């Protein structure tokens, strides 16, 4: 879907206050089951193969498991892994695996118990270094972190780091983060690739009872007690229903057709929180503008091609205003593009976006990956709303760039240019609040005289352009680390370097970010990591590569008449977590 933006969206007329807040109805859902409405369009089909993009959230809903969990103090808790050791030179790791964990029995097939061989298989299948055709959501992240995992015996895994990251155990193999699910190698070997693509064989406390493609799936408590008693489900059966339209989710909760729903803030404000309870995994999703196409590294930073020249950069073929091409479009092209990116950043009224689209319940974001409520935030990296200044800044540049179909009758005259902004997949993509933020940004840019379009086609179509480093559209996304729950000192920028070539990217690459990412990742203590994170903040703000817009609360609301309690464990990369904690009345 392409929409032409011709003016800033008017602040939506404040919804009339209802005479009374919405109170809890008697639910019409079956007894003994919790029905949850989720947003998005990515429910897909049952899929138990990481390289075929099995759902990342299986480890969060309790269908699958991974190596570690997150403790309340942000340290790691053992899960499938019992412990680990790191080589003194940070070159490798050894991980010990819990023994005796039974896999789920699927269609009458018993695949035995989990060993280190299943763990190694699952990671290697997901990692694009070992499985180049992998489309796992973190295929590129894994490629940037480590090579092949080896099962030395049934309880021992070893691997070498390609680039050590001190948070590997807190993020990439942790339920809280962007981890992988452990699946059965025996199921793959015995039943074949096609079979496991349609059947999940994992070790979680729940297993799939029914999965209707792009509609819903139902999970049921496995027979017997779970091997980890604290994960034993409090509810026998849970159904997840995909409802992409936010207002429809609110309507279903209001009428009692679902017991819990993901609500956008403007809808949640209408519900009586004496009758409904908010629950979340602790995060808000930061939506910002990532200026793709700025590919400033010249050689591969890691992997089999390390040190070799990169292929020709398609994003530099045309002189695009916000893309700086070193030496290709004039000596001042880098500086000129930087100024244009700043102009586009200060043309956005972040407070208006928060007030209008998020009912004032979100938070303004100035620089993606950084939370302005953190004690580390100094206020020195803010983008003021200054449309007049944006016009002046663009007019001060040499208009030798490609202008597309932009008209000349606005405030920018001959300096006007055409720009499209893509709505990324977060929170449901173009049909959700993400699409509304894209529309708003396009509108603000239109106000200063740019010809703008908002793009809302499927992420499956868009993703190859960021993997292949060919995208030139600014896009609205949280891009890997844009979550309020991620600690300040966590390494940032991996997916803004050539370390993830062959996998996901924000769309730009920088040797400065490469250096700062490595310093954060290899830091021996939190203070050193924080210092490098602060330098990263200085750099991306000065270069205007990822100006933020707004952080969207990512919460669920449940009907107290049906659900007794549902405390979620904290998670940085999931909004629905630890379903074993859900308890019915």
Feature-to-residue mapping (PLM):
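A structural signal for short loop-to-beta-strand junctions that line the ligand-binding cleft
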Residues: 56-58, 84, 146-148, 204-209, ...
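Long beta-strand-rich cores associated with HINT superfamily self-processing modules
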Residues: 558-585
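Mature extracytoplasmic/periplasmic domains
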Residues: 361-381, 554-560
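Surface-exposed binding/hinge segments that line
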Residues: 96, 132-187, 356
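Extracytoplasmic/periplasmic ligand-capture domains
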Residues: 1-20, 24, 70-72, 91-92, ...
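Residue-level recognition of beta-strand termini and adjacent short loop/turns
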Residues: 87-89, 151-153, 213
């Amino acid at each position: 879907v392409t929409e032409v933006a011709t003016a800033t969206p008017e602040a939506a007329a404040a919804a009339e206050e209802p005479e009374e807040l919405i109170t809890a109805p008697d639910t019409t859902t079956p007894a003994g089951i919790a029905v949850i409405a989720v947003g998005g369009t990515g429910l897909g089909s049952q899929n138990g193969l990481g390289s075929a993009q099995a759902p990342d959230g299986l480890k969060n809903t309790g269908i699958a498991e991974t190596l570690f969990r997150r403790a309340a103090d942000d340290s790691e808790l053992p899960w499938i892994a019992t412990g680990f050791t790191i080589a003194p030179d940070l070159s490798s790791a050894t991980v010990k695996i819990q023994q005796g964990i039974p896999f789920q029995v699927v269609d009458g097939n018993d695949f035995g118990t989990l060993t280190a061989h299943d763990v190694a298989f699952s990671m290697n299948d997901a990692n694009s270094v070992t499985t180049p055709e992998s489309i796992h959501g973190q295929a590129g992240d894994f490629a940037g972190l480590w090579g092949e995992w080896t099962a030395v015996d049934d309880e021992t895994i070893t691997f070498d780091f390609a680039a050590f990251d001190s948070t590997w155990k807190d993020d990439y193999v942790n339920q809280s983060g962007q981890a992988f699910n452990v699946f059965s190698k025996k199921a793959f070997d015995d039943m074949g690739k096609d079979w496991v693509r349609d059947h999940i064989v994992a070790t979680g406390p729940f297993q799939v009872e029914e999965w209707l493609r792009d509609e819903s799936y139902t999970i049921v408590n496995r027979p017997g007690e779970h091997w980890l008693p604290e994960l034993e489900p409090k509810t026998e059966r849970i159904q997840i229903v995909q409802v992409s339209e936010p207002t429809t989710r609110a309507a279903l909760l209001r009428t009692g057709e679902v017991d819990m729903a993901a609500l956008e803030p403007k809808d949640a404000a209408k519900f009586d929180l004496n009758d409904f309870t908010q629950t979340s995994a602790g995060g808000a999703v930061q939506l910002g503008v990532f200026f793709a196409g700025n590919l400033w590294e010249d050689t591969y930073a890691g992997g089999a091609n390390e040190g070799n020249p990169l292929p020709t950069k398609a994003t530099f073929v045309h002189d695009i205003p916000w893309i700086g091409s070193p030496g290709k479009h004039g000596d001042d092209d880098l500086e000129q593009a930087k100024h244009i990116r700043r102009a586009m950043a200060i043309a956005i009224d972040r407070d208006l976006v928060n007030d209008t689209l998020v009912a004032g319940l979100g938070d303004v974001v100035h620089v993606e990956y950084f939370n302005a409520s953190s004690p580390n935030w100094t206020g020195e990296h803010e983008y003021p709303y200054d449309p007049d200044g944006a016009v002046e800044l663009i007019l001060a540049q040499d208009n030798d760039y490609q202008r597309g179909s932009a008209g000349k009758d606005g405030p920018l005259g001959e300096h006007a240019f055409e720009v499209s902004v893509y709505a990324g997949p977060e929170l449901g993509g173009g049909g959700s609040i993400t699409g509304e933020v894209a529309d708003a940004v396009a509108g603000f840019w239109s106000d200063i005289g740019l010809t703008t379009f908002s793009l809302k086609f499927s992420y499956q179509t868009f993703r190859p352009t960021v993997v292949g480093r060919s995208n030139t559209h600014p896009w609205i996304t949280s891009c890997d680390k844009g979550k309020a729950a991620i600690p300040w000192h966590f390494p940032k920028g991996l997916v803004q370097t050539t370390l993830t070539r062959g996998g996901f990217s924000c769309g730009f690459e920088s040797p400065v970010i490469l250096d700062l990412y490595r310093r954060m990742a290899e830091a021996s203590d939190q203070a050193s990591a924080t210092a490098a994170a602060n330098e990263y903040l200085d750099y991306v703000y000065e270069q205007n590569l990822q100006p933020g817009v707004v952080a969207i609360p990512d919460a669920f609301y449940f009907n107290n008449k049906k659900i007794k309690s549902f405390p979620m464990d904290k998670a940085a990369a999931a909004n629905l977590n630890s379903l074993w904690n859900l308890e019915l009345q």
